[in-house]
């Protein structure tokens, strides 16, 4: 648990600091320019070259207390609560040289790869008031050949010795005691071994943290037997991780430190434009073009976890020559392999930090883009019907669901604490027990392109701890002209709900004419929630835009301006994370400039529904969240808050549909809505099943109820809203009593 830094003065007037025990691992990134990134997914190539360093970091402690006998007793519980994450960062040399680490944060480990010259960083290393720990082939504190926990401990003890006179003596004594008490965790027997492969690497990192060290038997061999052998080892290791989580269980501290998702679905992807770029005017030779096209077709047609090679041209491109020759794969194949390795190690950092399970999906998930495109075209069509939209959604949902092996659904249905979708594919529409997963579970999505944004979003983060009073002022960025027909909907919706939250939330509205107004409004706001009210759009092959009063703006352009962005951004606008468009969405743009989580939309959203959604969200923060604190005696994370909102949206749309069709009357509407409300907000695993059961009491049979519910879902904004980023890392606590009680619970656990 992080504590505030405190100082005391010595007799000579110098200040002595407390000591922070967190360990931070740093990898220099000397090629951070996006124009130099890998062309299939957008990673810094130096990080791709150093994926092995990340693999090592994923096995290391998160702080100096974790490996003590006392720390090991609750190590796994702390990680499951997001309170002991492995922290590593890729930093450019320029950024490093501008930032000398203060003495109260001394446990820094700089990892230098083969291409890094230690002398490049010597001036920065020597600028510290303590000996920085540097791991390098030569010129560092520890070489890779001799690296071990014992060597790391020795280096940290030397750091403590150098901090005498800078850090409080009792803090140094405690740090030394922790370090001297480091013990390797007891090794445990998993009971089986698997062939090592990227598809199970994140799960193996989780199991490694839990003490299961000897879990592989060489490399994975069954690469020519279809997806079944891959699925088998994914299922096996996923089950082991989840059983370990079940063994540990919930702790009292989880009332305050809510657990992140127990399960992630991971589908690495490639920029769509890679497949669409013409080679006609390129400088490649005719043979080179044929090889590139062959590789593109292989990548595009990949269904499973490996490549299917269909002809001699593809064999030549894949192996670099005829079968039997020494393999010399095409540069694109090599680059894709390096991208996948880096992406896997980054997801492994997350799984090791949370003791969570990761299900790697076959590439079939990414091949559903054609069906998504058809549904998007239907959604945008001027003339459509309720039935046609339901049928169009059924088709795209069926395709996406079919791309997920059936063996994985037991874990998806049983997932606790939400599900994280690490994917560009629209996995949020997977059919789970008759409805899209986005209305059945609390979900958040981490985009996988561009690669450098993916890394920033997927790496573990310090939790943001808020209380309900941190939402006492909400900023609304208004970008609608008064003559716009939809400009009054926000006022109408807010005025209806304002009596319910006026004592707790104050609305601050800013009219946004241009980019400068937007940046000024953000910089002048120090609250936690900003809402954009206006129009959005995303044309094909262009960045998405928000329409301000005087101009359109691409949010990605604000990166160099570095505005202050609150942790939560809600975009009440159309197509802010549009389906069937490139990665340069407005929602991704807000993540890139610093938002912790963004609520975006994959389709156009009805202005009345959007205004009502925002008004109900403010009411939820003001009234439901405090009531939930009291009812369940625990805090809530933002993932739970918005997940409940989306489910309530579908419930309302469904009940209105049933009433409009004459299937229920007003009295039945109230009764059914109440049952659904209690099921959703009471934490029922499958609340809509409770609603269907209640409908039967009012004369609606199950078959008709489910038919109408699926139709309501296909036509509801509930399937358009999408949480992106890391909402699970924002925890909203009660205003009263949290800090003292949370500290007491944490100490009791320790």
Question: Language-model features: where?
Answer:
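Domain-scale, conserved, charged regions that form catalytic cores
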Residues: 2-478, 482-510, 514-517, 521-524, ...
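Catalytic cores of nucleophile-dependent amide-cleaving enzymes
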Residues: 10-12, 29-32, 135-143, 447-470, ...
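Active-site-proximal C-terminal subdomain of hydrolase catalytic domains
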Residues: 31, 37, 149-154, 160, ...
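Short, low-complexity, polar/charged sequence segments that are solvent-exposed and flexible
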Residues: 44-48, 439-442, 494-498, 527-529, ...
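Structural motif
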Residues: 418, 528-529, 568
